[in-house]
């Protein structure tokens, strides 16, 4: 039964724990006066600045300002959650954790999540068994160079073309359709029919850092678009918080000196197969703040691997922008850029383990990449150009929380632009600098803008839609434009963006559509269809809610006729499913 740990027990546990003894089993402490010192485990340093005070049962680092009690230390050093830290201390002292029962609502949520974890595990096992029963799927994996040990290690699976075929093969268990929809296995279309989201795909189970399977990735066996899909957001799966391969890495390499980040599931598996056992993936998306935090709690050095083309450089720049605010002293971000038309899977099979390790060794430090990128098109003989680029560089460097790292970067920048005293840059007060060098100020994201942008950039999406005539009478800003765009895309099959845009030339909407046509919405190609349909579903929900409110108001004022009552009942029933 889930429970709350009493505060009294936590206080007692801290009281009974000698912080010196616990830390000394992990770090060599040396007594200096009343305190104990060692090199800080959370940043690189030559002179020990990590101090532990016996009287205060507290640690503090003068270099990176990290501090806390023994629970904080275990959470940061061992990458444990708060509850896991309490359990670890209780285990050390041989104590049983007393529990306070929580309320019924929290109990229900706990049991619900526990059941979903169990369901995803069972489904993953079902998929895994099925891959060995489906010859063409099994051969596909082997032909990709992935051996049987990796299939088992990553628990790879296969979902057949029809979910019910899978159930027939495994007659022991019949699964509840509603629960399968909750974890994103089954999906219901706008027209109301249900199908297997991952049908005819290789399955990659996604685990959280505790080993629970929280979602799935799926790779098509043919050229079906999209090539890769992920589970949707659910109660247990939040894409921006998960990293593929993290759990598997921590099992064999709990304290990696560095972590290599690649884009694809197969890239992770290939590199691990070639003994690069510190490789994980961001599920095919741009890195999030939460993922960066998790990575830096696990290792001091993160290496991102990208294609060497323009899109790879742009992705690396976006990653750098997100990473800067997490680079404390002792932490580092590096980049590897592969040759064009190569990915980690293909190149390690061509070059082998040793040559790929050389690429890792030659990875570019974030500071070098930052300045190289900014000054790539800057004329260093032009004072105005140097000044403009420097203001952008200064504002970026100031995002870095590590003061020592920040100082070194200011020194490097000052030498590059010919300023002898780097303190001039540090003391220069620069505000409101636009640091985006690849993109202009982003367009404000609204659901209707997203679907219009996706459609204008991918006209084929219109062919995936059912009839939308029932939406024509509703008034939502941008809806009429979207419906007109759908009509034009359907009337021009196999058309491209330029062709569709041309239909709007000399119309008031043309400029807006042109902006959306080049809008970097940062949605990966394999996710576009699902994202588009999900966004359209949100719009339909907004329309239903708006109509519901109008009918309720009308009912209170003048009453409803039989047809309107039935409409309200239907809307209430539909929205109750959400």
Swiss-Prot record:
Organism domain of life: Bacteria
**Gene3D superfamilies per UniProt:** 3.40.1360.10, DNA primase, catalytic core, N-terminal domain, DNAb Helicase, Chain A, DnaG, RNA polymerase domain, helical bundle, Zinc finger, CHC2-type domain
Assigned keywords, A-Z: DNA replication, DNA-binding, DNA-directed RNA polymerase, Magnesium, Metal-binding, Nucleotidyltransferase, Primosome, Transcription, Transferase, Zinc, Zinc-finger
Positions binding Mg(2+) 1 in this chain are: 263, 307
Tell me the GO BP annotations in alphabetical order: DNA replication, synthesis of primer
Domain Toprim intervals = 257-339
Any one GO CC term of this protein is:
cytoplasm
Reaction catalyzed: ssDNA + n NTP = ssDNA/pppN(pN)n-1 hybrid + (n-1) diphosphate
EC number assigned by the record: 2.7.7.101
Specify the residue ranges making up the CHC2-type zinc fingers. 40-64
Report the SS bond pairs. Answer: none
Q: Where does Mg(2+) 2 bind?
A: 307, 309
Q: Example GO molecular function term?
A: DNA binding
How cofactor binds (record note)? Answer: Binds 1 zinc ion per monomer.
The reply to whether DNA-binding figures as a keyword in the UniProt entry is yes
The protein's required cofactor(s) are namely: Zn(2+); Mg(2+)
Pfam families under this entry? DnaB_bind (PF10410), DnaG_DnaB_bind (PF08278), DNAG_N (PF08275), Toprim_2 (PF13155), Zn_ribbon_DnaG (PF01807)
The answer, when asked if NADP is one of the entry's keywords, is no
**Quaternary form?**
Monomer. Interacts with DnaB.
Q: Tell me which HAMAP family the record gives.
A: DNA_primase_DnaG (MF_00974)
State the similarity comment: Belongs to the DnaG primase family.
What the entry says about domains is: Contains an N-terminal zinc-binding domain, a central core domain that contains the primase activity, and a C-terminal DnaB-binding domain.
| Function (record text) | RNA polymerase that catalyzes the synthesis of short RNA molecules used as primers for DNA polymerase during DNA replication.
List the protein's name.
Answer: DNA primase
* Species this protein is from: Buchnera aphidicola subsp. Baizongia pistaciae (strain Bp)
